[in-house]
UniProtKB/Swiss-Prot annotation:
Disulfide bonds: none annotated. One of its GO terms (cellular component) is cytoplasm. A divalent metal cation binds at H174, H219, H274. Its main location: cytoplasm. The lineage of its organism: Bacteria, Pseudomonadati, Pseudomonadota, Alphaproteobacteria, Hyphomicrobiales. It comes from Agrobacterium fabrum (strain C58 / ATCC 33970) (Agrobacterium tumefaciens (strain C58)). It catalyses: 4-(phosphooxy)-L-threonine + NAD(+) = 3-amino-2-oxopropyl phosphate + CO2 + NADH. PANTHER family: 4-HYDROXYTHREONINE-4-PHOSPHATE DEHYDROGENASE, D-THREONATE 4-PHOSPHATE DEHYDROGENASE. Pathway: Cofactor biosynthesis; pyridoxine 5'-phosphate biosynthesis; pyridoxine 5'-phosphate from D-erythrose 4-phosphate: step 4/5. Binds 1 divalent metal cation per subunit. Can use ions such as Zn(2+), Mg(2+) or Co(2+). The active site is located at the dimer interface. This is 4-hydroxythreonine-4-phosphate dehydrogenase. One of its GO terms (biological process) is pyridoxal phosphate biosynthetic process. InterPro entries: PdxA, PdxA_fam.
């Protein structure tokens, strides 16, 4: 199979959520939105019932990745992964956890084996997976473990939200805010920023990335008056990064980093915790932002929203963020093939 013929490996996510809805909508609007070919890893019965529920005609064909690209124009290609029970839209069930996890594992395997171009994941419900014994805080950490299992090499995953107006990275991710000051170390900031710098160059074609580093505390700590972390941890990290030739500057007061003029000064905002990064990202591009995992030996993107159980099966879920995630994955893959 040539590189040009590789499909994207799209996971079902939680089958009771809007993953099936938005995948169906993305395929139905593939021509008008220029959606790159994907193979959907999930349950054909879920797709068929959800398509009927939301009133979108879809021609389903089960296939392997090698056939997906040629099928994509006329059919919704599925690599079958039965859930094992009758899924009801909007009603999450622990019985779906195994298939949800297995779909992610299959997508990673296909991509590492060179049978798919990239992994694109639909939203999962962490609480449902935890009930089934899932031992990871979220997608990002699970993907890092899969990368280790597939390649034998440990990785440090970095979550970046990329939208049309801003890119953001939280240095700490899925931990309680009370634990952030302890988890936030100079070494973690330096490692995260090195990965950002490398991947913005290699995956996004930015020749000289500019990294704006936010402070942890209000006003970036006011030189220790409002907390010592920015003075003692964040600032030394930026000094080390600049010595390494990485254009990282800060710590900056986070409340002045996201207005129009400020965003022109950097390529990515490096934030200290989850909500410091994701609130501005979603405020500036809720429908068309993409979650990209940097630092992995394969490409992974996902829509920047959750399972939205409350609207699953109602025909009102927007596929915009998923389409953006599919397009970004395809663009990164195409860029990676230049000169390969």
């Amino acid at each position: 199979m040539t590189h040009a013929s590789l499909p994207l490996a799209l996971t079902q996510g939680d089958p009771a959520g809007i993953g099936p809805d938005i995948a169906i909508n993305a395929w139905a609007k593939r021509r008008e939105n220029g959606v790159p070919p994907f193979i959907f890893i999930g349950d054909p019965d879920v797709v068929a019932s959800r398509a009927a529920l939301i009133g979108v005609p879809v021609n389903i064909e089960t296939c392997d990745p090698e056939s997906a690209v040629s099928l994509f124009e006329r059919a919704f290609p599925i690599l079958p992964l039965p859930v094992g029970f009758d899924v009801q839209a909007g009603q999450p069930h622990v019985g779906a956890a195994h298939a949800t996890i297995k779909a992610i594992e299959m997508a990673v395997s296909l991509t590492v084996e060179g049978r798919a171009a990239a992994v694109v994941t639909n939203p999962i419900a962490k609480s449902v997976l935890y009930e089934a014994g899932f031992g990871f805080p979220g997608h990002t950490e699970f993907l890092a473990d899969l990368a280790l299992r597939q390649t034998g090499k440990p990785v440090t995953p970095v979550m970046m939200i990329a939208g049309p107006k801003v890119r953001v990275v939280p240095v700490t991710i899925h931990i309680p805010i009370k634990d952030v000051p302890t988890a936030l170390t100079e070494e973690l900031i330096v490692t995260t920023c090195r990965i950002i710098d490398t991947d913005l160059r290699e995956k996004f074609g930015i020749a000289a990335p500019r990294l704006a580093v936010a402070g942890l505390n209000p006003h970036a700590g006011e030189d220790g008056a409002l907390g010592t972390e920015d003075r003692d941890v964040v600032h030394p990290a930026t000094i080390r990064l600049r010595k390494d030739g990485i254009d990282a500057f800060g710590p900056l007061p986070a409340d002045t980093m996201f207005h129009d003029a400020a965003r022109k000064r950097y390529d990515v905002a490096v934030c200290m915790y989850h909500d410091q990064a994701l609130i501005p990202a979603k405020a500036l591009g809720f429908d068309d932002s993409v979650n990209v995992t940097l630092g992995l030996p394969f490409i992974r993107t996902s829509p920047d929203h959750g399972t939205a159980f409350g609207i699953a099966g109602q025909g009102i879920a927007s596929e915009t963020s998923l389409v953006a995630a599919l397009k970004m994955a395809a663009e990164i893959y195409a860029r990676s093939r230049v000169g390969a």
